[in-house]
Each structure stands twice: as structure tokens, then as C-alpha cells.
């Protein structure tokens, strides 16, 4: 059963040898065909009040080009800007809709061979860890469904049960994924060199270079080129 965690916290291992190994999986585009915008769109369309639904839906649609541009330029800036859209939504409502989000949006979008990839990692003796820029509560049902051991994800700040639109640091994105993976391995006695990483995006390049066994999955054009130049395995699970 999955045991999603919010963020890793580094701890001293007293110089003990790191003997374990893990498989770190990006989610959006790697295991599923949806992304964080789809998840928010679902919440916006099921907010509860008709005026709220209309306002948030129209705002989301109008900003899609901006979301795309920010995501292309800087994933960290995109995350900070995008998650402001959650401001004002209630924690209770978001959590109530989580299972519906999974059944209606996420589960149908799981790539056909994604589960096989995770099962293969488990047979190899790896601890399965999902690493995503998505909000933790949106991906918990997926982590459970896939049988992941842990999940490293972004966390929304709530004050008085209301979302502030701010993500609690550290923000899980592109280059910073390498840092949180490094911390996670240190905390859990896992060897980076024995571990695997899987992603579809060149923005996660650092995540691949921090482990000894990187794999490009459904890679974008730039990541495919990088994978070929470094002789990394290239997989298609779609």
C-alpha cells in the first residue's frame, strides 16, 4: 500500500554505507497522459457554486497559453504562478473531490504499460517513489493504485482550511527534483548509483543525472536527443 509523504527531510546516516536502491518516477507524461492543469480544471468545474465554476473555468481557459509559456521558460516560475489559481478553494472540498478526480481523470489516463514498468522496478528490488510537481493530495490515489512506496510532491498551504495559493517549500520541479531525490536517498540509506529514474521531460534532466540508472520514457525531442547521446535507455509506455 502506498505511503505518500509530503517532502523528504535529510538526516545524518553516520556514514553508514548506502546499500538500498530505489526507482524514482516522474508522473505527468511519464506514467499518465494528464497534467496539473487538467487536475485544477476538474476542481474548477466542480467547485460547488455556479458563479465560482464559471469564473474559475473561464480564467483557466484564458490563461492556458500563459501556462504553456511559463512552463517552457521556467518550471519553478510556472508552479508558483499556476498554483495561485487554487487560492480560496476549501481544503475539505479539494480532498472530497480527490477520489472522483482519480476515477474520472487520472485513472483513465494511466499509460497501458506504466504499471508493468513499476512492477519491473519492484521485482528488481527497488523502493518505488513517485516524484511530481503535482499537489500531493491530487496524486495520492494514483500512488495507492500503482502500489508506490512513497511519493514526493508539492504541498499547498492552507490557512483556516482555505488554500492560500502558495506552495510550501521546497517546490518540487525540474532541477530541484535532483535535490529532493538526493535528500531522500540520504535519509533512507539508498544508493544513488544503484537507483533508477524515469521521466519524459528534458526539464527533468537533473533528475536523470543524479542516479546511476536513468531512463527516458515517452521522451520529448530534446530528452530523446540527450538520451541517445548518453546511451540511456529509451522506453515508450503509451
Language-model features, listed with the residues they occupy:
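Phenylalanine-focused residue identity feature
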Residues: 24-25, 43, 67, 72, ...
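A metal-dependent, Asp-based hydrolase signature
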Residues: 34-37, 49-119
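C-terminal cap/substrate-recognition subdomain and adjoining C-terminal extension
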Residues: 2-14, 18-20, 96, 103-238
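Active-site neighborhood of HAD-like aspartate-dependent phosphohydrolases
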Residues: 4-70
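Acidic/polar active-site rim loop that often engages polyanionic ligands
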Residues: 40, 77-79, 161-166
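Intrinsically disordered, low-complexity N-terminal regions enriched in serine/proline/glycine
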Residues: 39-41, 85, 183, 229
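Generic secondary-structure boundary signal with a strong preference for alpha-helix termini
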Residues: 41, 83-86, 173, 177
Amino acid at each position: 500500500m502506498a505511503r505518500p509523504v509530503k517532502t523528504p527531510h535529510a538526516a545524518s546516516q553516520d556514514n553508514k554505507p548506502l546499500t538500498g536502491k530505489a526507482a524514482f518516477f516522474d508522473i505527468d507524461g511519464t506514467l499518465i497522459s494528464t497534467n496539473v492543469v487538467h487536475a485544477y480544471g476538474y476542481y474548477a468545474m466542480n467547485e460547488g457554486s455556479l458563479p465560482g465554476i464559471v469564473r474559475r473555468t473561464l480564467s483557466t481557459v484564458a490563461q492556458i497559453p500563459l501556462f504553456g509559456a511559463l512552463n517552457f521558460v521556467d518550471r519553478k516560475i510556472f508552479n508558483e504562478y499556476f498554483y495561485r489559481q487554487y487560492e480560496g478553494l476549501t481544503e475539505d472540498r479539494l480532498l472530497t473531490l480527490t477520489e472522483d478526480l482519480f476515477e474520472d481523470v487520472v485513472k483513465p489516463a494511466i499509460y497501458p504499460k506504466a504499471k508493468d514498468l513499476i512492477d519491473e522496478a519492484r521485482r528488481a528490488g527497488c523502493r518505488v517513489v513517485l516524484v511530481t510537481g503535482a499537489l500531493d493530495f491530487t496524486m495520492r490515489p494514483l500512488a495507492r493504485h500503482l502500489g508506490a512506496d512513497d511519493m514526493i510532491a508539492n504541498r499547498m498551504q492552507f490557512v483556516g482550511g482555505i488554500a492560500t495559493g502558495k506552495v510550501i517549500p521546497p517546490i518540487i520541479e525540474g532541477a530541484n527534483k535532483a535535490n529532493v531525490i538526493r535528500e531522500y536517498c540520504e535519509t533512507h540509506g539508498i544508493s544513488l548509483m544503484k537507483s533508477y529514474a524515469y521521466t519524459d521531460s528534458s526539464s527533468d534532466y537533473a533528475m536523470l543525472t543524479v542516479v546511476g540508472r536513468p531512463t527516458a520514457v515517452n521522451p520529448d525531442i530534446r530528452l530523446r536527443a540527450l538520451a541517445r547521446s548518453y546511451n540511456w535507455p529509451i522506453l515508450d509506455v503509451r
